[in-house]
């Protein structure tokens, strides 16, 4: 058992349990299990980065840095940055390798949100590459013949849950706007590794074994992950020639080679012919897909502006609400070992999640009180609810200012992710924060052309109404499902000072908010902040990270009136601080690293 808050937390996190999946209740299913899995022959730079993570200290650099979820992907991005590429160039290289070595988490068959700081203009831009509901999606897509919601995994596994992928279009759009390196060269490491093979890490092997029954339902998926009927084992060398060929098409034809032609036809055929659970995605859906530029959402916290992705992401708004409520309290004076600090953090999160469940969805379809939700007077009003000594006995959505009727029912949609986060700073001063996903671990379990297809449509509410009142996050054709992904860039005096984000389903919001508090209020460096044991409260139950000193808060939080549950809380935080150089932190619960020069 890990008993000390610092510095042994990192070493403790490296010994967390093998991958598990938790109970399947609304927003309750954990993402991927923790592992420090080594991947294959490691360079001196990777060994040094892994040692820094294990020692609980940041990786430091002067010129550029990349932090992501797998050393092979980080190395691919580092090569691009070292050769003079931008953060956008490096992101493409990182993503296409992640889609190979971490296929359960993200890839070409999924979607992503990207936050970009442009050093030349001083401007923040956010790009929405979220998956989209097909034109044939009906309001009852995830309901049975009696109008009742399907069981969650009955909806997830197969074609019904597949939305139009956005990641390839986002890669191309980011490169078009901000890239300098030749597009084809960004795929070289991904193609080489797919052709020559990579060593299956302990984490990937454990996740395959845990999900073997679902992976076995579809022949193409089974032949890749369960060769000869047995799950891939740690240490096996795995090639993916189909993925290599897909990358060659993207390298030569761009995203058009994905959204049209043979790859698009294969995607549609795979989805619509999925045995037992066919979907409704069409070639027209693929052909019409577009990346959408949206206004960044920025909320004030202390001397910082915490900026991220707006709707359909709920991440920046909910993180902003949590921090905006807590801006009314002196957390720095309380410190990380104060139960009172965690009471405030937990109940601020509950208030923010109440607003999230009522108001947040795709704002192209649903009028939203976006600015009202993060307006300081409104958040001060919400903060006043925390003045009593104990946990809130009741939590309800607030009434943010808005010039439109707000008659929405509360949503209990499930968000069960397999996700990854990338943070990059380049030599030109540009900063990228991108969270990328296929939703659940292994997505829909459907595989084509060497990559898995998402199950993103299950992020919609399965119900359309509650007690006759419409639910904002209900499914509609062309709509993008609400997400908790929270790619974040923290600004101070008009300049970026921190890039951060994480996987983790709806707990992403708590992971990111906690890490920003640890860094901004408690004086932790980025490695300490991302490694800090998790305490997360969304709907009333306080989850504390099992096997860490966070469990020591259980009795104190219980005395304050919280129900407490010790469980695995497997984030995948990757952060870069931009202050007196570059300082990178990588979550010890996963196998990622930070590299820089």
Functional labels for PLM-detected ranges:
Residues 24-75, 79, 87-253, 258-260, ...:
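Noncatalytic scaffold domains of N-terminal-nucleophile
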């Amino acid at each position: 058992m890990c008993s000390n808050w610092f510095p042994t937390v990192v070493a403790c996190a490296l010994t967390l349990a093998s991958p598990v999946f938790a109970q399947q209740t609304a927003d309750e299913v954990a993402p991927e299990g923790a592992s420090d899995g080594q991947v294959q022959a490691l360079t001196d730079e990777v060994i040094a980065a892994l040692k820094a993570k294990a020692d609980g200290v940041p990786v430091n650099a002067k010129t550029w840095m990349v932090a992501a979820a797998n050393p092979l992907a980080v190395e691919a991005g580092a090569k691009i940055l070292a050769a003079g590429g931008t953060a956008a160039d490096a992101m493409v290289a990182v993503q296409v390798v992640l889609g190979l070595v971490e296929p359960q988490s993200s890839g070409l068959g999924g979607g992503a949100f990207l936050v970009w700081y442009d050093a030349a203009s001083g401007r923040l831009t956010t790009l929405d590459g979220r998956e989209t509901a097909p034109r044939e999606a009906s309001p009852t897509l995830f309901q049975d013949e009696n109008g009742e919601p399907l069981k969650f995994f009955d909806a997830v596994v197969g074609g019904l849950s597949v939305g139009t992928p956005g990641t390839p279009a986002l890669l191309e759009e980011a490169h078009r706007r901000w890239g300098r390196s030749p597009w084809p060269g960004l795929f070289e490491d991904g193609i080489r590794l797919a052709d020559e093979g990579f060593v299956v890490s302990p984490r990937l092997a454990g996740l395959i074994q845990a999900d073997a029954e679902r992976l076995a339902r579809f022949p193409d998926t089974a032949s890749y992950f369960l060769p000869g009927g047995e799950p891939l084992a740690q240490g096996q060398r795995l090639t993916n020639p189909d993925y290599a060929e897909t990358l060659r098409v993207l390298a030569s034809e761009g995203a058009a080679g994905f959204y049209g032609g043979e790859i698009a036809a294969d995607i549609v055929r795979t989805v619509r012919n999925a045995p037992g659970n066919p979907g409704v995605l069409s070639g027209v859906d693929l052909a019409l897909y577009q990346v959408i530029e949206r206004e960044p959402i920025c909320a004030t916290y202390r001397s910082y502006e915490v900026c991220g992705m707006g709707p359909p992401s709920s991440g920046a708004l909910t993180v902003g609400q949590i921090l905006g409520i807590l801006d009314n309290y002196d957390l720095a004076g309380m410190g990380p070992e104060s139960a009172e600090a965690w009471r405030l953090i937990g109940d601020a999160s509950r208030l923010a999640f109440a607003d999230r469940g009522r108001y947040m969805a795709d704002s192209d379809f649903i009028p939203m009180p976006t600015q009202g939700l993060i307006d300081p007077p409104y958040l001060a009003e919400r903060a006043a609810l925390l003045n009593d000594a104990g946990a809130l006995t009741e939590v309800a959505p607030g009434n943010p200012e808005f010039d439109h009727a707000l008659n929405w029912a509360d949503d209990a949609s499930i968000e069960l992710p397999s996700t990854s986060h990338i943070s990059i700073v380049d030599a030109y001063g540009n900063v990228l924060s991108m969270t990328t996903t296929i939703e659940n671990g292994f997505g829909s379990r459907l595989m084509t052309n060497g990559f898995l297809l998402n199950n993103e449509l299950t992020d919609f509410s399965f119900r359309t109404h509650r007690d006759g009142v419409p639910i904002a996050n209900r499914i509609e054709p062309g709509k993008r499902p609400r997400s908790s992904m929270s790619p974040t860039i923290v600004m101070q005096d008009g300049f970026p000072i921190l890039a951060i984000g994480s996987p983790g389903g709806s707990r992403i919001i708590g992971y990111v908010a906690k890490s920003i508090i640890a860094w901004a209020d408690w004086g932790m460096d980025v490695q300490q902040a991302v490694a800090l044991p998790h305490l997360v409260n969304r709907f009333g139950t306080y989850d504390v990270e099992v096997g860490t000193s966070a469990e020591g808060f259980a009795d104190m939080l219980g005395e304050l009136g919280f129900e407490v549950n010790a469980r695995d809380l497997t984030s995948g935080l990757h952060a870069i601080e931009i202050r007196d150089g570059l300082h990178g932190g990588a979550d010890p619960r996963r196998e990622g690293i930070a590299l820089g020069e």
